[in-house]
Amino acid sequence: MTLITPPFPTNRLRRMRRTEALRDLAQENRLSVKDLIWPIFITDVPGADVEISSMPGVVRRTMDGALKAAEGSRDAGHSRDLPVPLTDPAVKTETCEMAWQPDNFTNRVIAAMKQAVPEVAIMTDIALDPYNANGHDGLVRDGILLNDETTEALVKMALAQAAAGADILGPSDMMDGRVGAIRQAMEAAGHKDIAILSYAAKYASAFYGPFRDAVGASSALKGDKKTYQMNPANSAEALRNVARDIAEGADMVMVKPGMPYLDIVRQVKDAFGMPTYAYQVSGEYAMLMAAVQNGWLNHDKVMLESLMAFRRAGCDGVLTYFAPAAAKLIGA
């Protein structure tokens, strides 16, 4: 696009900023409640259904709390929820069998949500870390994370979530080939209409800390995740990952984290034109909330500005812990 800008005073850019009505006419991007996906922390661990200290205003929810949250999502108009489990350490193992049990707590919550509030689209997180004794997203042997064996486990996990009623599967593990394996398994099992939102460009970021506290993975994690999550210095690699996942059957793609990687969002959207999402992760949320609590930033203004940045960068939607608060301000 070639920009043609007449010289001043023929062109006075402030003309279209003079009143709110004129500013609205010139506004290029808009934020809607339909752009929001709400990650909800869930737990059946006794006494764990409390506010998460590193994420002010965010709580872990029992089954009843999760169902009320889904009802709230429907009523507010952001009818897309992602239940994320805090798993009892007693059931975590290095083989992660609980991840694909049909009656694990996550799958029970998915089924109950779909029965109680069928209008809400349920997205899932497919990775082994909530069930892994060593805190990793995949199976580990002799200090090495096993790609192909992990993919087999993720397929079983995806099938169990699909059977429970999930609408969108979200493989977040960053194993090579897992999107294709999950897509083939869905077709073979008759789940041809279940969508895959691939965490295609997930970086080995320092912004995940509060999330790992929320799901009890911080103390369990042995080492780091740099052998499977992306180097924060890389951008061309993100495009290769996205291209591969689209070819393997992803219906939507995600960049994670969000705000520090909006350049990646823009590149992905421009290159592929696919439905593109980003995750405003726990560290981003905690950073803004800490400034709000100290009186340094205005909660509502900084929340909406941060979410608008995702839309301006090319996101079709945002996974954000701000979803309920943002929905109240935006309105249906």
From Swiss-Prot:
Catalyzes an early step in the biosynthesis of tetrapyrroles. Binds two molecules of 5-aminolevulinate per subunit, each at a distinct site, and catalyzes their condensation to form porphobilinogen. Pfam families: ALAD (PF00490). Homohexamer. The active site is at 202 (schiff-base intermediate with substrate), 256 (schiff-base intermediate with substrate). One of its GO terms (molecular function) is porphobilinogen synthase activity. 5-aminolevulinate 1 binds at residues 212, 225. Its EC number is 4.2.1.24. One of its GO terms (biological process) is protoporphyrinogen IX biosynthetic process. Keywords: Heme biosynthesis, Lyase, Porphyrin biosynthesis. 5-aminolevulinate 2 binds at residues 282, 321. This is Delta-aminolevulinic acid dehydratase. Does not seem to have a metal requirement for activity. Pathway: Porphyrin-containing compound metabolism; protoporphyrin-IX biosynthesis; coproporphyrinogen-III from 5-aminolevulinate: step 1/4. Belongs to the ALAD family. Transmembrane segments: none annotated. It catalyses: 2 5-aminolevulinate = porphobilinogen + 2 H2O + H(+).
